[in-house]
Amino acid sequence: VSADGEEGFPGNLEVEMTYRLDDEVNALNIEYRATTDKATVVNLTNHGFFNLAGIAAPTPTVNDHIVTINADFYTPIDEVSIPTGEIAKVEGTPMDFRTPHTVGERIDDKFQQLVFGAGYDHCYVLNKTESGSLELAATCKDPKSGRLMEVYTTEAGVQLYTGNWLNGFEGAYGATFPARSAICFEAQCF
């Protein structure tokens, strides 16, 4: 619950998230519901970290993960990773995941956007066939384990984050997570 006026936004906002594992189709479904009593801004996402290779010791990076994103455009960031408000073409840049590429293939390129984000930390403007429809936004595959993740969303954008600022924190089973040891796909408005 977010009270009317909290963080400067109008309305009492109630948010409900449901996480559901579907064993029949081997899927994790995340559903969001929000209600408010005044017109306000709501832009919910999730920041789940994934490493499809598993948590071997040491934790492998996601550099070998193969990513595709159904987007012709992305939103550039400034030197402190804040979106500039521009929308730029991915074509001809290391931001282009319209065809499969490994994360590590171009992540250390001297392309200004990758330097600003210390890797990928950008919102991609999805090629939607219909506003609000549930569509495939991205895929991610680990070639060693064979694990494949498909990301579907009703939102207009998806943020790709490659764990650039992970600093070796300890997770489950004593695994540590250094930079680039996880990947996020954050469905969102932009």
Q: What feature does the model see in each segment?
A:
Residues 1-190:
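An exposed, glycine/acidic-rich loop-and-rim segment of catalytic or binding clefts
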